[in-house]
Amino acid sequence: MFRATLALALASAASIAAAATTPTSTLDKLDSSAPWWEKVTVTISGDGQPQSCRFESSLTPGAAKSCDVEASAGAQAKLSSSSSKDQYTRITFERRFSPGAQGDADAPAGDMLLGQQVMALAIGAKGTVEGCKIVATGGDMRPGYGCKEASAEKFQASAHSTTAAPRQGYMTILVYGHQEHVV
């Protein structure tokens, strides 16, 4: 039952998260020489109403920001017909970058992994993504962030000459969540 309800919440949360207006990366260009992460956490009540949206980044520790989110009528209808009014669903959409070697791709303890995608990136000397390949997937759903979106990212340019071989990094996209009951 939990998985089915969470799956419905996820379908709704995905549309909600897409509508969330969050700050993008805190830097104009992302760092390809050090690991970092960014995440958006959306809390949805049992009636399908978004209760909160929070953006956090390791690039600016301790500077979490609120984000605006709207639920579509369809998302609200799905959740209100399948969830208890005293229940909340918390869904987190996270991306992690690891230079060189593939990093941790697990959901935090206590959360259920709903979707995962790991991409190997080749980052050129000018900071553009020159190559992308999905190297691992997991969970029941596929995150809406793939090679097309990763290829649009801008990383800091390399200090090396423009003939240097591309730097390798791994972008991990995770969707995970859990339900909470109000007592």
Predicted regions and their residues:
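Sec-dependent signal peptide recognition
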Residues: 1-9
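Charge-biased low-complexity segments
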Residues: 2, 19-183
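Generic detector of low-complexity/intrinsically disordered segments
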Residues: 8-12, 81
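N-terminal signal peptide c-region/cleavage motif recognized by signal peptidases
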Residues: 12-18
